């Protein structure tokens, strides 16, 4: 390996106009879930122009290979591509042109960063002591993209020995471009969706005595569920139960037949026993409270995503490599978290349960840059001046890790 970290960072900085163009084009045209035709077209076109042969993977993923000219390990670099089903109100001049859809989590940033890394790695392909697999993933927001691509052969042909992801952070008072490197072990919570359907008997709002009101029952269920955390979990056990959507009826003078609520369960229990307890008690409480109000309740669960597990040697590598590249711009994340897992979830966790993995974060703007809101808010903004650092970080990690592990048998 001949290139230095300073040289790679300089090359990445020269890509800034292209990185910004990719990111802002994606931002204007957000797509959600697995339905990403225009996003995939941009990614595949860019990769092809660089000299890659991109391939489809499963429902909507894209993969490409760099290196392979020298024997060695294979490292996976991943970017997610999907947006959120929310209406943008950021005020950016390149805001979403698609009503009800927005890149509010920064996946447009990730995609542009990995495309930049692809360009850097192609320029230094002869120096790669192994293979880099580039993964552009759909459907992260619904926790289905990663398991779908794994089922489609993501981690084989060639077999992946290590995996890396970066995620941008907005709205945090950190120096722009700071890379946060986590400790090892569980760093992010598991997540599971729930859906509760409460059925009663509808009728005119003036005659509640002739009805069985599902809204009243559902409201009491929502309140009762909050007692699970305080009364049923052991002190120190992490569990979050949040109802984020509640729907019932369509008119102010009509008691509906049905009320529904949707939400998430998050835990940091690797065996998910805490999650099992919460699910069991949710079902019992919902059905019991509903019965008290002469209603019935159906409770279902879906889209489970496990905890993120960070490999200790990779986390140590990450701190070393990011310090080489960015100096004081690399920060030990445990200084902020106290070593405790975060409550957010990420479907790259599925990969972390299959191969050694590290997930890092990049500060992409705080209040000083006008980025006052966090992810998933309609007003969130991201400072795309950090894109080149993200590309360099992806590229430098791959170059260094393959070099360091060229002669190591796993």
Where are these regions (language model features)?
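Electropositive phosphate-/nucleotide-binding environments in soluble metabolic enzymes
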Residues: 2, 6-9, 13-20, 33, ...
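Acidic/His- and Gly-rich active-site-bordering loop/insert found
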Residues: 2-103, 108, 112-129
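Divalent metal-coordination and catalytic microenvironments
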Residues: 26, 77, 107, 134, ...
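Structural motif
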Residues: 73-76, 132-133, 160-164, 330-331, ...
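Non-cysteine beta-strand/loop elements that form the S-adenosyl-L-methionine
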Residues: 76-78, 87, 194-196, 359-364
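Histidine/acidic-residue-rich, glycine-tolerant segments that coordinate divalent metal ions
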Residues: 84-86, 91-102, 108-109, 121-256, ...
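Metal-dependent amide/peptide-bond hydrolase catalytic core
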Residues: 219-410
